[in-house]
Amino acid sequence: MKTSSALLLLAVFFPLMLLGQHDQHANHTVADVEPQPLLAQAMRLQEALSFSGNALQAADAAKLKALQRGPLSKETVARIQAILDPYCLNVVHINPEGRVKVDRGAAKAVLVQGGWTAFLVKVYNEAGITAKFEATSPNALKPYHSPSFEHRVKKEHELTEGQVANRFLDIQIYAGRPLQPNLSGLKLEYAVVQIYSKDAGKREAEIAYNAGQGSQDIGFRNSTHILFDAKPAVKVNFDVKDDDGTATMASFLITDGQEHASGKFKGIYPLPSRRVAAFDEYPDFFFQPQIYRKSGEHVTLPPGKYKVTYSRGPEYVPQIKEIVVPEGVASINVGFQLKRWIQLAKLGWYSADHHIHAAGCSHYDSPTEGVDPKDMFRQVLGEDLNMAANLAWGPSWYHQKTFFTAKDHPLSGRKNVMRNDVEVSGFPSSHAGHIVLLRIKEDDYPGTTTIEQWPSWTAPVLSWAKSQGGVVGYAHSGWGLEPMEATNKLPNYVTPKMDGIGANEYIVTVTDGLIDFFSAGDTPAPCELNMYYHTLNCGFKTRLSGETDFPCITDARVGQARSYFKPKNAMDYDGYVEALQLGRSYVSDGKSHIMDFKVDGLEAGTGESEVALKSPGNVKVTARIAAYLPEKQDSIGAKIAKAPITEKPYWDIERSRAGQSRTVRAELIFNGAPVDTIEVQADGKLTDISFSPKISKSGWLAVRIYPSSHSNPVFVKINNQPIAEKQSAEWCLAALEQCWKMKEPNIRAEERNAAANAYEKARKVYRELIATGSK
């Protein structure tokens, strides 16, 4: 089995079999070297090459092994070089002053498109230095500029299409076990250089080496120009079938399982560091390991064996398929059958993420200012999002706003809809909290032509957006809401810091009816929910909505946190934002679900979400629950479960798992505190649950699987008495005072009076609630 695997892996990285002598290489045999350490290093080198799937030819490996059995002599040194030199792309000479000079070696300059090729580098180290040995190339520079946070790309960051095309390589010195990143100090040793080519065909590259700062020789002699011949890879055509047999888009993570030079995503195909969405056949993102392909599309892979992990968002069960790409063929076909554990759309619930971006954060701002929104739509399809709001914001604002139409993106269809809307972030009001504006008709604030002219606090922007039919809320709510004294208790009564960009000024604007939804799912749950619970306890009826803030808080995938909504009428963008306003939705990581939440038969999001009781008494609470956890917790799940809730992923069902079981707890919440719990098996099956709590005062009820999913509230009024928890109102008033202290210095002088009046108006609201709650 080991022999056949080794042969197969040779097919992945066949360069070490390309041994024809380079026409112009000189004789670089080095004498006067101790044979014992050189032979020991050669044996480690052979072992490392085997680990990386690049073993020496069998005959050469046998010759090396034979040298171990013979006497150690000058002949041993010569024979080692005779065996290894034909594999060398370059010969590096470090003179006694530590200067590096590079010559061409004997190996043929043959690469493979879309794959790694390994060569040896012979190092004649006269200086005996032990610095880190590195390989570089201008052809391996980043083919993009990232991260991006500028409103417009800076001139010095601009890359032309020609520059991008010339950056087709990745190059690394392999320093994994049993090798090491530093030179040993021995007069002669060998290193392994691994080169990846994005392209096929003839390509010239400049390859350079150094052994620490300032080691380059005069006249740029530490580099060589090499004309490579990159052999074409195999076209692997994908046939992707959904659970019902229809063709679809899905997510694919392709790995070879081999040892590569250290670095992010080095064993992943296509190599992320060479991906440029603007110019590639398919717009794969360089900061993600996965790619997205629909049936009929393809990926190019060099011959070899691969592991493909494929799925389509959290409603699907991830699967693994091993594929073999043979040599000597132009293309092959591979089929993938997706497997769901649940299909919420069939139950009347549709997935949505109101916060994704085509620019900023992990995206590049050159060669283009972010990606085209149509590239984001592939991500939406591949993660099975029915609805997505692609938000233009500060970074690359002036370019990205050109995609704003106040209509659905043209690629939208009956099952998947995307619209370009706005996040007011990177604007003068951002210090008070970033805000999401959905379904707006106009994206320029009245009287402005530049970002700098927008208001410096959030209320005017919210009011303007709502005046044009927009549905609005604060983004990444928990940022800035960390308690002054650390606690994860829910609810808690510690004043928040109010020093961030989340739902900070929400404490003001919620009192004026300016907020439709409160974002959840992408910041620590205690910070998000503590603010939310306290404002509900003051009688405000803001609804929860799930968001990811891709690719900022996470660049893993869109829809990592999401809403599931039940449209009142059509499943379209209007139906979606209406469902958010009404609370016909719940927040979820997609791995647990709280459907059809009702109190005395009234479903959340209907009839003002309010149940009226004449006097204290019991109510019947029902919901339909579904959750999915693997039967056995894997290492990734265990890591998530043990991580502090202040570390990502903030919302994940692994945090909800009861010990090592497959059980999660559905909690009934009244006014923010759990009052009952039911254990549910996370086996993917639908489970109907019910509670019968006694309600002794006006308040609100919700169901949560913490921190994986959370329903919207249903409000219960007894004898039409208001919901007014004194302690919550006191907390809100303290938070308001802290917010003014932190935000007032950054509000423009000419706007400060209006802001001060709004804060004072909110103070009066909370004081009245405190007085009401005291009765």
Give residue ranges: language-model regions.
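Catalytic cores of extracellular degradative/oxidative enzymes
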Residues: Y292, E315, Q319, A345-L544, ...
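Positively charged n-region of N-terminal signal peptides that target proteins for export
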Residues: M1-A6
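C-terminal functional module detector
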Residues: H151-V153, Q163, F168, Q172-R177, ...
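Long, low-hydrophobicity ectodomains and other hydrophilic envelope-associated domains
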Residues: A31, Q36, A58, K65-A230, ...
